Regions:
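Bacterial Sec-dependent N-terminal signal peptides
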Residues: 1-25
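A broadly conserved detector of short glycine/acidic/proline-rich loop/turn motifs that flank catalytic sites
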Residues: 10, 101, 123, 144, ...
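Extracellular (secreted or membrane-anchored) zinc-dependent metallopeptidases
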Residues: 198-539
Length: 541
């Protein structure tokens, strides 16, 4: 559908969708074809290109959530509490849900109305939801198998009844441009002969301290929360809920907000110690501020949030692999153009935390801005053509070398390996790992083979899981020589095939099957027309 947005002089914002009004019996959600919002400037409402407009029965949802079991008391697939979630295509997906707090119990006692949950689809094991509910409303992410993430977010602040359901891929990044920078890039990659696990399937809980400078807090203020403290913490909880959904499933890493994180929500710009609007300066300041307020021994990693006085959002990590490292574990910061933290901004912060956990950039582009900025390209981990598309890529920010818009919510194989090494045997191994009942899956990529030039091919893996869990497969090219982009068929080195979303099928066609059938040539999946060697790795999840 194409939304129509009208802004009148009386600040009346009208949202219209082409979908007929709907009401599902017994549902928490009602579909709307139009919504009028009073008192909001256009800049406060950033709309995806396509969306589904909804009204939520808040009281009914609150009653349902009060019955959700605690995570420690039930397996997710055995929860009897069911929640229908509206998808952008007009359908609903039913999830079994349970509590999944991201705040330390002591912090949760101080803010009992801020809560987090997780769920698994009743009919598709690849659909997972991670959401939070608080006085600022419902904020949720659904991870799907092939369509990319779905988000359900409030239309505007101070309205907990009206929501948008949309695919992240339909969010126009030009509305909220993002930028990343990192220092100490350029480390060598782990040996590519490694064929083991990206992790050991043990859960590692890291104590996370998120600071919000006074400008971020003030921008979070509303009529019901004039100081902005509660809203800022609720927004941070939204962010960590979504990040945990990815970090837990990809890395068996859980982030938990420290017991006194509320002390890091500042309200006085004259005394908070931050240089708002400058992420690099804030990242350096954050270390001393957090150490001084909560103590260096009371957290494992920290990141500061501020407000960007210009356009868009920008983040930085002053180092690669700083988690658990006294003296540098708080040297990360992001300044945002929207304190509601849109999905793109949360992905940016997820990316910066990836640096703090030991991952480098994965893009191969070396000439297009912003990819060509000094110190950002790391040849040792440049396995993705162009801008790349995974979390540690520069998707959407590399001009003509953009593979796609928003980053996909998974890590490239090299990032999994870097972070896995860092938290198991490297400097990020400070938490005591918790054994889980989940067994490691096994996978076999098969043998090597030779094919004629310019010939489509397929790779097939064989996977097994002792627990009977549904598996996904992700085939990725593992050649990192720097080349010209888009890749050419005459390239004798470097990546010529992009990564694709993990799939339930163990088979990947190169290029993708629809283009093979149609006889077209995808820009980011290029068959070599000359003799060369290509390396591939498959990751099973």
């Amino acid at each position: 559908m194409r939304p129509i947005i009208l802004l009148t002089l009386s600040l009346l914002l009208s949202f219209s969708s082409l979908r007929a009004q709907e009401k599902t019996a017994g549902s928490l959600w009602e579909g709307l074809d139009k919504l009028e919002v009073q008192g909001y400037e256009r800049s406060q409402v950033n709309l995806p290109e396509e969306f589904r407009l909804l009204k939520l029965d808040v009281e009914q949802l609150q009653a349902l959530l009060r019955t959700a079991p605690e995570r420690s008391t039930v397996q997710l697939g055995q929860s009897t509490v069911l929640l229908d979630i509206p998808l952008p295509d007009g359908s609903y997906q039913q999830f079994r849900i349970r509590q999944a707090p991201v705040m330390h119990p002591e912090l949760a006692k101080k803010f009992p109305n801020i809560n987090s949950y997780e769920g698994q689809s009743t009919d598709n094991p690849f659909f997972r939801i991670y959401f939070a509910f608080s006085p600022i409303g419902f904020y949720g992410m659904v991870l799907t198998e092939q369509s990319g993430p779905v988000f359900i977010t409030p239309v505007v602040r101070e309205d907990t009844e009206h929501y948008l359901s949309y695919y992240e891929k339909d969010f126009d990044l030009t509305q909220e441009p993002i930028n990343c920078s990192v220092q100490s890039a350029g480390r060598p990659a782990p040996g590519l002969e490694y064929r083991g696990m990206a992790g050991d399937c043990q859960l590692r809980t890291f104590r996370l301290a998120i600071a919000a400078d006074a400008e971020f807090t003030a921008a979070s203020a509303t009529f019901t929360d004039p100081t902005g403290v509660n809203n800022a913490l609720a927004t941070i909880n939204n962010m960590v809920t979504v990040i945990n959904g990815v970090y837990q499933s990809e890395l068996a890493i859980q982030l938990q907000l420290v017991p006194n994180n509320n002390l890091l929500i500042f309200t006085n710009a004259a005394t908070d110690g931050y240089t708002d609007g400058n992420q690099n300066t804030m990242a350096g300041e954050n270390q001393g501020i957090v150490d001084g307020i909560i103590g260096s021994g009371n957290y494992d990693v920290s990141h500061a949030l501020g407000v960007n006085a210009g356009t868009g959002s920008a983040g930085v990590s002053l180092g690669i692999g700083t988690v658990c490292n006294n003296g540098s574990k708080a040297r990360g910061a992001t300044v945002v153009g929207n304190v509601a933290l849109s999905p793109g901004i949360i992905t940016l912060i997820m990316h910066e935390l990836g640096h703090q956990f030991g991952a480098d950039h994965t893009f191969n582009e070396s000439t297009q801005p912003i990819c060509s900025n000094a110190g950002q390209l790391n040849p040792a981990t440049a396995f993705e053509p162009g801008s790349g598309s995974t979390i540690m890529s520069y998707a959407g920010t590399c001009g003509s070398s953009n593979v796609q818009g928003p980053r996909d919510r998974y890590f490239h194989a090299i990032s999994l390996q870097q972070i896995g090494n860092y938290v198991t045997v490297g400097g990020g191994s400070c938490p005591v790992p918790t054994p889980t009942t989940n067994n490691q899956p096994t996978v076999n990529a098969g043998g090597d083979f030779i094919i004629p030039v310019s010939t489509p091919f397929m790779l097939t893996a064989t996977g097994n899981d002792a627990d009977g869990d549904a598996l996904t497969y992700c085939w990725e090219q593992m050649d990192n020589a720097i080349i010209t982009h888009p890749p050419q068929s005459t390239a004798t080195v470097g990546p010529v095939f992009r990564t694709q979303l993990p799939s339930a099928s163990p088979i990947r066609f190169f290029p993708n099957l629809p283009t093979v059938i149609s006889g077209t040539s995808p820009t980011w999946e290029v068959l070599p027309s000359v003799g060369r060697k290509m390396n591939f790795r498959v990751t099973v999840r």
